[in-house]
Amino acid sequence: MKNTNDIAVLIVDDSALMRKVIGKVIEGAPGLSIAGKAMNGRFALDMLERVQPDVILLDLEMPHMNGLQFLEQRKRLRIDIPVIILSSIAKEGARVTMQCLELGASDFVTKPFGSESAHLRTVSRKIVDYVTAYGRRYKLLRRTRRCLAMDTPVERPAGEEDLNCLDTQERASLPSVCARAPARDRASYTITPTEGARQTRIVPLRESGALQIIAIGVSTGGPSALRHIFAQLDADLPQPVVVVQHMPAGFTREFAYSLNQVCALEVKEAQEGDLVRRGRVLIAPGDRHLTVERRSLATVAHINSDEPENGHRPSVDVLFESVARHFENRALGILMTGMGRDGAAQLARLYTEGSRTIAQDADSCIVYGMPRVACELGAVGEQVSLDDMAATINRYGKVFASS
């Protein structure tokens, strides 16, 4: 029997087999249920008011109304139900997926293929994690709207005390210790642990130096978050930017191209030997690690296929480690929304070296996992909301360029 607290999922795909496969994934996950199934976007639009889903899983290629057309109608009708794209790994699928993100889709997962393959198990876990993350956030948003309309307190169902910490391995063991600071004080506050929480206090080895590079790590929720930030970065930002976004192979080139359309800086997928220079943003290629090397005359990017770190390739920790090694106290490390702990350990190293560090705050994260672990380690100098992140980067870049 369906629980009213379940996250209701609408599956939109023209393949009966795919609807069945994904339906089994949803039905097999605790806390999730199927709101309905539709064979194209037109049927999905007709069903929305009746089934009231919390998340929509949307195929791209469908007759009568495809994924792009559905998103265009969703935008026109001002429907804010989160949409997760079910994408193929083909080049054309990657291009259309990025167009979907531009139209307001929240995120994407690659379509399952095969029946008992490791890929199917991996994708199934990702579908469940993404649906849970976006669905819980939307349910809270909808509940908050109802309570505000009735002028009553917002109540969360039992077990949803912290809707942002959805990392399946760590959600029970990582109480939040990052104290929120007033806006006027955010640049200088100290992080204090909550009652009973453990936290390592890091004492930097040296004072922060002149800022020479900005490194960003992000996972779940990252595509739309980075688009939001990059659209607001100043064209005269003095430092180069390097980014790890957890993303499969075949998508990052189109992702970088999409970001380049909205950013005043040059955004490109990193290639071996690329110059890391002012006016440029380098995105780690899917399924490859990105590192930087500071030489006497220039800083260059390196790409490798070493083993995954923290279960990820590209890994934020791998990038941050190289930044800490070559730039010591002259970097800005930023850890944003995402499951797990990738990036937290090496953000702590950056902080220890004297570099400046920022974590996205809990309220604006789709999943408050990676930033939360960094806070537990005492590695965060400032918490910043997504809406304030671009302005903060612009401010850091200019104020600390010659400190």
From Swiss-Prot:
GO molecular function, one term: phosphorelay response regulator activity
The enzyme's E.C. designation: 3.1.1.61, 3.5.1.44
Compartmental location: Cytoplasm
Post-translational modification summary for this protein: Phosphorylated by CheA. Phosphorylation of the N-terminal regulatory domain activates the methylesterase activity.
Top EC class of this enzyme: hydrolase
Residues annotated with 4-aspartylphosphate modification: D59
Residues annotated as domain Response regulatory: 8-126
Domain notes: Contains a C-terminal catalytic domain, and an N-terminal region which modulates catalytic activity.
Listed HAMAP family: CheB_chemtxs
Name listed for the protein in its UniProt record: Protein-glutamate methylesterase/protein-glutamine glutaminase
Natural source organism: Treponema pallidum (strain Nichols)
